[in-house]
Amino acid sequence: MGDSSSSTSWSSKKDTEDDRMIAFMLSEEYSKLDGAVGRRLSNLAPVPHVPRINCYIPNLNDATLDHQRLLQRLNVYGLCELKVSGDGNCQFRALSDQLYRSPEYHKQVRREVVKQLKECRSMYESYVPMKYKRYYKKMGKFGEWGDHITLQAAADRFAAKICLLTSFRDTCFIEIIPQYQAPKGVLWLSFWSEVHYNSLYDIQAAPVQHKPKRKHWLF
C-alpha cells in the first residue's frame, strides 16, 4: 500500500514538473507572438480587474450585439481568435492554448487553478459569496464555467499577466495582474459577453485552427 501511494505521488509530481517545463519552453518560443498582440493593443488603457463570480448571463439579443462588437474590435486591432469549444471549459481551454499552444490541456490548467484556490484561501475567499470549500470543489468539476476569480487565481498560479479583449460596451480591455509576484509572461484572451473565452493572436501569426466542437455555442 505504501509503495503504491509513493509511486502515485511521484507520478503526480513528475506530471506537474513536466507541465511547467513545457509551459516555460513554449512561453519562450512564443514570446514574440505575445509581443505582437501587445503592440496591437498598446494604445488601450486597461481597466483594473475585480475578481467576482459569474452573476449575469445576457439574453440572446444582448449577446448578439456583444458578439458583433467583439468582432469589430478584433478587426480594428488586426487580431483573431483561436476558437475553443463552448463546453463549459472554455476559459481553461483558452488559457491552456496560451500556455501550451493547445487547448487540450484544459484539465491540467483547471487542476492548477483549483490548487491555487485551495492553497491560498485568504487571497480569494472575500470575493466568494458562498461556502468557500463548496466554491472550489464546484470549480474542480469538468464543465463548470470559470469566472473572474479563477482568472485571478490563474494569473497568480502561472505568474502571468492575463489580458482580456472584451465585448463590453464601456470596457474594451482588462488586465489581470499576479498579486504577489512580477509576471513572467502574458496570456491573451478574448471575452464575449460573460459567456465565452477564446485564445487571442495577431492575425499575421495565428496558428492553424482545428475546428472545435460547437456544443452549447450561440454562434
Swiss-Prot record:
Amino-acid biosynthesis recorded as keyword: no
PROSITE patterns per UniProt: OTU
OTU domain location: 79-203
Pfam families: OTU
GO molecular function terms listed in the Swiss-Prot or TrEMBL record: cysteine-type deubiquitinase activity
Keywords for this protein: Hydrolase, Ubl conjugation pathway
Residues at the active site: 87, 90, 196
Reactions catalysed: Thiol-dependent hydrolysis of ester, thioester, amide, peptide and isopeptide bonds formed by the C-terminal Gly of ubiquitin (a 76-residue protein attached to proteins as an intracellular targeting signal)
Coiled-coil regions listed in the entry: none
EC identifiers of the protein: 3.4.19.12
Cell inner membrane as UniProt keyword: no
Function: Hydrolase that can remove conjugated ubiquitin from proteins in vitro and may therefore play an important regulatory role at the level of protein turnover by preventing degradation. Inactive cysteine protease.
Similarity section: Belongs to the peptidase C85 family.
Protein name: OVARIAN TUMOR DOMAIN-containing deubiquitinating enzyme 12
Species of provenance: Arabidopsis thaliana
Lineage start: Eukaryota, Viridiplantae, Streptophyta, Embryophyta, Tracheophyta
Gene expressing this chain: OTU12
